[in-house]
């Protein structure tokens, strides 16, 4: 197998670029397939066939902490807990990680962002996901790999995310921009299939994560992504941009897309809409303006 590049992949990797590294001991491939409302779907899909040597990460068990009365649906894991999970997976500081999901990179981007948060920069997302892998005619496997335990110490970066109080203070300021990754109909409050309250945070602008992707699930060219984000940001700097969604998952797709377009410094509202509405006194807005 080819040795890892001296310049680790940090955003996106294609199926063709990943294929030569399958089975390399210093590469970790993580299947993140998941479906909200059907939490066993991804694990069943993994059992039916996955990229060879990939392990499985469950959104609820591995990429989130238990829900609390004040949290959103997918709280950030405790750094020490997440580091223990990564150690069990075989991660070391020199490991190149590649995350993938079915095709839209939302769940894979959650792992990508969590790894960056705890200090592991050598992580990329498979562009187009498992769909792109199989479309390329590349092999799959049903074997669950056994990996030696690694060693990883979390170094969480508090600058990468904001809590609800911090978002409330910034959301309507002219020098900050809050982008909501949910679908337009959810943002407008016309429908709400998941959370008990519909609408959005006052001051937020809608930037649906699906607009970052083509029909094949691959990300749009970097120049196109940059133009779309700059339109949504409307003159606000990257490091004064906050992204959110329903629970801090699909918003990570926005962060990945921004970085793939050369735009670094945006922050995640980790609790997102499902945490915002925990307190009935917090304002909500409906409509698109």
Specify the residue positions occupied by each region the protein language model found.
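Cytosolic catalytic domains that perform sulfur/thiol-centered chemistry
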Residues: 1-289
């Amino acid at each position: 197998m080819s040795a890892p590049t001296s310049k680790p992949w940090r955003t996106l990797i294609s199926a063709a670029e990943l294929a030569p590294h399958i089975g390399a001991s210093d590469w970790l491939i993580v299947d993140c397939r998941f479906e909200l409302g059907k939490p066993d779907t991804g694990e069943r899909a993994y059992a039916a066939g996955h990229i060879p040597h990939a392990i499985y990460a469950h959104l609820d068990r591995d990429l989130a902490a238990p829900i609390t009365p004040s949290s959103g649906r997918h709280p950030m894991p405790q750094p020490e807990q997440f580091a223990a999970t990564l150690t069990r997976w075989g991660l070391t500081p020199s490991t190149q990680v590649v995350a993938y999901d079915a095709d839209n990179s939302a769940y894979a981007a959650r792992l990508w962002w969590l790894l960056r948060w705890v200090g592991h920069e050598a992580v990329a997302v498979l562009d187009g996901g498992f769909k792109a892998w199989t479309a390329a005619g590349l092999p799959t496997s049903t074997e669950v790999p056994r990996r030696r335990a690694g060693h990883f110490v979390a170094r969480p970066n508090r600058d990468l995310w904001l809590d609800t109080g911090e978002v409330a203070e910034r959301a309507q300021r002219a020098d900050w921009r809050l982008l909501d990754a949910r679908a337009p109909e959810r943002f407008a409050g016309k429908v709400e299939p998941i959370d008990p309250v519909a609408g959005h945070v006052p001051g937020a602008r809608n930037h649906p994560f699906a607009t970052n992707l083509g029909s094949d699930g691959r990300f749009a060219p970097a120049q196109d992504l940059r133009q779309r984000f700059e339109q949504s940001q409307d003159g606000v700097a990257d490091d004064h941009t906050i992204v959110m969604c329903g629970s801090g998952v699909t918003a990570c797709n926005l962060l990945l897309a921004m970085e793939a377009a050369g735009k670094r410094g945006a922050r995640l509202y980790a609790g997102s809409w499902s945490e915002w509405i925990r307190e009935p006194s917090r304002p909500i807005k409906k409509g698109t303006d």
